[in-house]
Amino acid sequence: YMIDEANIESHGMMFHKDETLANYPDWEVPFMQRMSRMIARDRNYSAIVTWSMGNESGYGKHFETLYDYTKKIDPTRRVQYEGGGYNSKSDIYCPMYARIWRLRQHVNQRDARPMILCEYAHAMGNSVGNFQDYWDLIYKYDQLQGGFIWDWVDQTFAIKDENQRDIWAFGGDMGFVGVVNDSNFCANGLIAADRTPHPHIYEVKKVLQYIHFEPLAFTPNKIKVTNWHDFIGLEGYTLRWAVECDGKTVQDGEMDFPKIAPRHSANIELPLKALPADGKEYFLTLRAFTKHEAPLVPKGHEVAIEQWELPSAPSAKTVQPVEGTLTVDRNNETLTVKGNNFQVA
């Protein structure tokens, strides 16, 4: 599914109602041209489900004109605009970088519109640390419908530094060319400019996986599997499981998933053997892999992973008696306990 966005952005003109271009009469025609030409070009692409009127351009009467025009010529699609906020001229509430409390707030108020974050999870450097917290809410409430990570790829280029080392360059690295640059703020992607994955993309992959695993209480060999796909079952995937202790695999196996319809769950029993009562920690790791090759996805590609500690009986520990006696000294200010080789006051 795609949201098609008009090339309307005037971030530098601020967002005040008296400064935004969206209220300047001279800019009404350019606004309309960019919106109408985009729709005329792309309206027959069925993957487009929503038209966006632009980005970071404040809010003004020109956006109200664009909304009414778009709904008139294409009543089949939704129309959104980030700067519209809770104004009526946006079918979707689509803020950027909303805090998690705002997601809860939207669900709890009476506005029935879906909420989609037009930008969130700013992926610059060691980032997306609270990504799971967002998706715990999104999975919980149908009204919360995801968002768009800013952004996908670092916008940098390869050059040699003064020591002839390869580096990724940005901003002023190209030398003074008479224009303002934003330093390294263009390097905020999930992948590098050469499409090498950054470490934090694996956090995103984990959170967005379509197969979810949960432990079932009091039954360590049974798990709950949820299929979050919209259209397909899990017949095309293989489940591999392993029990690990001290970093070593002590049990493992492979099995097919049962038939689980899209957006449905099922309980699965794993052939786990009883764990020894040795007081050690045992962890169950679950992985799902593709059975067949598909466009862009090879056979055997890992699509989901989960891990949790298994309940196990503690080892019987013998309490060794301690020789010697304790003495207690008490005065008006302190209480002192003394024993062999120690003192506590």
Region locations from a protein language model:
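Surface-exposed coil/turn segments at beta-strand junctions on protein surfaces, enriched
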Residues: F218, A261-S265, L275-G279, P298, ...
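Intrinsically disordered, low-complexity Pro/Gly/Ser/Thr-rich segments with frequent PxxP/GP/PP motifs
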Residues: E244-Y282, A288-F289
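Short amphipathic beta-strand/extended segments with alternating polar/hydrophobic composition
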Residues: G253-D256, P298-E302, Q307, N340-A345
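Beta-strand-rich N-terminal accessory domains
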Residues: T285, T290, P314-A345
